[in-house]
């Protein structure tokens, strides 16, 4: 059986990269939450 997670860096950045997050209000809120929490990595 084929596994569900097939890693692909291009898809990863197109779907959950920083620039994509900044496009929507919800995405910007997510980045701000992660900043407030002190995450080392904010997005893919």
From Swiss-Prot:
Keywords of this entry: Ribonucleoprotein, Ribosomal protein
Any GO molecular function: structural constituent of ribosome
InterPro entries: Ribosomal_bL34, Ribosomal_bL34_CS
Entry-linked Gene3D superfamilies: 1.10.287.3980
Keyword Ribosomal protein set for record: yes
One GO term of the biological process aspect: translation
One Pfam family named in its UniProt record: Ribosomal_L34
Disulfide bonds, paired cysteine numbers: none
Record GO cellular component, one term: ribosome
Region ranges (Disordered): 1-26
PANTHER family named among the record's database cross-references: LARGE RIBOSOMAL SUBUNIT PROTEIN BL34M, MITOCHONDRIAL RIBOSOMAL PROTEIN 34 FAMILY MEMBER
Family membership noted in the UniProt record: Belongs to the bacterial ribosomal protein bL34 family.
Protein name, entry field: Large ribosomal subunit protein bL34
Organism: Bifidobacterium animalis subsp. lactis (strain AD011)
